[in-house]
């Protein structure tokens, strides 16, 4: 496999501003890890959220909620595990793995509630809760992934505790706009007794993430 890493202020030079913004307050510089493998077959890109520790930022988590936040890189770990399996079994794929790796920390230059940020794609985002940082780093990584026009993009993330509220601890919620992928995933989940639950793209909800000040509202949690 070939691996390249974009670190610190180089993220700004490479137009990955959201990854830089989320991680700039930490002593360890934010970075984007880019792994590629394989020269034939369909193009598969995996994107994993790599928030290596999450304090919540200026919207600081309570102590009881912060204790396990070293696990907020679960998406990155999962895609690396899947990539290892793909490479070890020699699957006929052109594989790419993108991991935005950051710590969401607190310092004088941390991003703030009510900041307006511009993403790689050019969309602006109003920050109303700095503890919703995962979707920011994924946004830039997914935009980069899409530029390569892969046959399929799969992202994995410990994105929100609201998933547990919605479907409980036993079901893994997911979104997909690919009916064939949905059928394959649901079949595999049933075969291996590892249940998943498809979440809806419900058009009437779209105005809830369009605040008017920016193109998008980061979160409904204020």
Residue ranges and their predicted role:
Residues 2-221:
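A generic structural signal for tightly packed, nonpolar segments enriched in small/aliphatic residues
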């Amino acid at each position: 496999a070939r691996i390249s890493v974009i670190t610190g202020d180089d993220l700004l030079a490479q137009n990955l501003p959201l990854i830089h913004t989320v991680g700039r307050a930490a002593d360890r510089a934010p970075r984007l890890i880019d792994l590629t493998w394989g020269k034939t077959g369909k193009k598969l890109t995996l994107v994993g959220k790599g928030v290596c520790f999450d304090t919540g930022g200026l919207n600081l988590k309570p102590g009881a909620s912060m204790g396990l936040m070293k696990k907020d890189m679960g998406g990155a770990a999962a895609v690396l595990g899947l990539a290892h399996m793909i490479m070890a079994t020699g699957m006929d794929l052109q594989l790419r793995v993108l991991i935005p790796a950051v710590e969401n920390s607190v310092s004088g230059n941390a991003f703030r509630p009510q900041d307006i940020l511009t993403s790689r794609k050019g969309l602006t985002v109003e920050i109303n809760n700095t503890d919703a940082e995962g979707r920011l780093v994924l946004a830039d990584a997914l935009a980069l992934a899409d530029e390569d026009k892969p046959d399929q993009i799969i992202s994995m993330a410990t994105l929100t505790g609201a998933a547990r509220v919605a479907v409980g601890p036993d079901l893994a919620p997911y979104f997909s706009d690919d009916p064939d992928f949905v059928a394959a995933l649901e079949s595999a989940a049933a075969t291996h007794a590892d249940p998943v639950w498809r979440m809806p793209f419900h058009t009437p909800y779209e105005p809830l993430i369009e605040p008017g000040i920016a193109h998008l509202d980061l979160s409904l949690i204020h």
